[in-house]
Regions:
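Class I SAM-dependent transferase core
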Residues: 54, 58-99, 142, 500, ...
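Mobile active-site "lid"/loop adjacent to the S-adenosyl-L-methionine
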Residues: 137, 174-214, 227, 231-239, ...
């Protein structure tokens, strides 16, 4: 049930339309899945998924799920990064940006990662996705989700928007601000959204949203586009927020929210929600509960100037090529090191080092002298780690063998083109593995990002009992993979890694992700 403040406000704004607009089609919260173009097409997914699906009106890659008992986290395709489970109208904002391969894209408030996964799919592995989350625990969830989705070209930050604005002025071609909001569109989905709601919260979120929008304006390049979205109905956070932003930033114009897509959904904005400021509400978009979603607001803003030219497919901008070359040189210098093995490196050290590795690897990309160790780092010099990766890649991932690699302790990273900054980076590129007990051991992200390129695969299907066995952490019978490391797939999509010996696949699926 909505709060008294919410109902009184909305009845005053909507009058007789209140009951109609807030009349949801069902008593339970809407549920949906969005298919990743990094894996497949919506049609192929629908044909294989064995779900009760209906096409979503909010996104061409999304479906509404009509199964009350559906548990997305247990579906093998979820583990394979084929789809992301999200409320249907939440999938509507990312496509409005019109992202194209080769662009630099920022998701400024990205956790848990649903919209970032959509942006990554639009980039198709080309260009750069920077996904930021200010809250550390949520940033870790964001990193895990983007790894599961197999995103190969992401930088994951745990930063304040103001620091990003200072470090990367006019850097991005596209920016998404899915702002922290009062969550009025979450009332049916999360009871805590009701208990925490208040007029004071709305005011607080509106002030925070304004600050974040100002930071987004600073990092957007001339001619770039910004999409602002919320899952609330509060005027101060929606139409009023956009109107106030345009007053502060005359270099921006309000564009048609649907200008980058060839379909329509939802409704226009509301003229009595602008706080008395001028705004063409026909250009913004609202989704009401009666329209099949829990509620969303979106606006698209364009910065004055000429958009930067995009690089040719498979190529980089000149400055991006320089950043990659710098990363490669940093890797070569690390590879020439004569570091001594560290003794007394026990399991507790390994767990701690692995947590630090995701932070430290990017410092290696920036050419800094850090001493962060990855699991097993005490057992190999940088030169040995790089040589072990190249030997491993030549056998199992030949397409990756010649890519620039950065050595950090015992870990190896395939970097992305990103300039040197002091920002807190959790991951920049794909952390492919480390040397342990004298041998190269691949990371889970290597298989999710590049599993389709692996030369040795154990091929499962959705109905194969071995699929659930693998996801549960058990050994399975090897039928298609030869001895050695392999990528375990389901219907051709990568689940994770394993190692074949004696006709069995030893399970290397991460324990934290396994089915219980």
């Amino acid at each position: 049930m909505p709060t008294e403040y919410f109902e009184a406000r909305e009845r005053a704004l909507l009058g007789q339309r209140y009951e109609t607009l807030y009349a949801a089609p069902s008593d339970s919260a809407a549920r949906g899945v969005t298919v990743s173009a990094l894996r497949t097409t919506p049609g192929t997914f629908a044909a294989k998924a064995d779900m009760a699906l209906e096409p979503s009106p909010f996104c061409k890659a999304a479906f509404v799920v009509r199964e009350e008992t559906f548990k997305p986290g247990r579906h093998p395709y979820h583990h394979a990064g084929v789809f992301y489970s999200q409320e249907p109208s939440a999938a509507s904002a990312a496509p409005l940006l019109g992202v194209k391969p080769g662009m630099r894209v920022l998701d400024l408030c990205a956790a848990p990662g649903g919209k970032s996964s959509q942006l990554a799919a639009a980039l198709q592995g080309q260009g750069l996705l920077v996904s930021n989350e200010y809250v550390a625990a949520r940033a870790d969830i964001l990193k895990s989700n983007l790894e599961r989705m197999g995103v190969p070209n992401a930088v994951i930050l745990n930063e304040a928007p103001a620091r990003i604005a200072e470090a990367l002025p006019e850097f991005f071609d596209r920016v998404l601000v899915d702002a922290p909001c009062s969550g009025e569109g979450m009332f049916r989905k999360e009871a805590v959204a009701v208990t925490q709601h208040s007029e004071a919260l709305v005011k607080q979120c509106a002030e925070l949203g304004a600050q974040i929008l100002d930071c987004a304006a600073a990092v957007l390049a001339p001619g770039g586009q910004l999409v602002y979205s919320t899952c609330t109905f509060a005027p101060e956070e929606d139409e009023g927020q956009v109107a106030a932003f345009l007053q502060r930033h005359p270099e921006f114009t309000l564009a048609d929210a649907l200008g980058n897509v060839d379909y329509t959904f939802g409704s226009e904005g509301e003229a009595n929600r602008t706080g008395g400021l001028p705004l063409d509400v026909t250009r913004v978009r609202r989704v009401w509960p009666c329209q099949g979603g829990e509620g969303h607001f979106m606006a698209r803003l364009v910065k004055a100037g000429t958009p930067r030219a995009l690089p040719a497919p498979g190529e980089y901008r000149p400055e991006e090529q320089l950043w990659l070359e710098a990363a490669a040189q940093a890797g070569k210098k690390a590879g020439k090191g004569k570091g001594k093995p560290t003794k007394g490196f026990d399991k507790a050290d390994a767990r701690s080092a692995r947590r630090e590795a995701s932070r430290g690897c990017h410092e290696a990309v920036q050419g800094r002298n850090t001493r962060t160790r990855d699991a097993g780092a005490g057992e190999a010099t940088p030169a040995q780690s790089l040589a072990a990766w190249q030997e491993f890649a030549a056998r199992y991932f030949p397409a990756l063998a010649q890519r620039p690699a950065v050595v950090h302790g015992g870990g190896v990273l395939l970097p992305v083109p990103f300039p040197q900054t002091t920002l807190h980076v959790l991951r920049a590129g794909v952390f492919v593995g480390s040397v342990q007990k004298g041998r190269f051991v691949p990371e889970h992200h290597l298989f999710t990002a590049f599993g389709a390129q692996c030369t040795n695969r154990e091929e499962l299907t959705l109905t194969d009992p071995r699929t659930v066995e693998y996801l549960s952490g058990r050994e399975i019978e090897a039928r298609t993979a030869a001895d050695g490391w392999c990528c375990v797939t389901v219907d051709g999509w990568p689940l994770g890694g394993g190692k074949v010996s004696g006709g069995r696949v030893k399970n290397h699926y991460p324990k934290a992700l396994r089915l219980l």
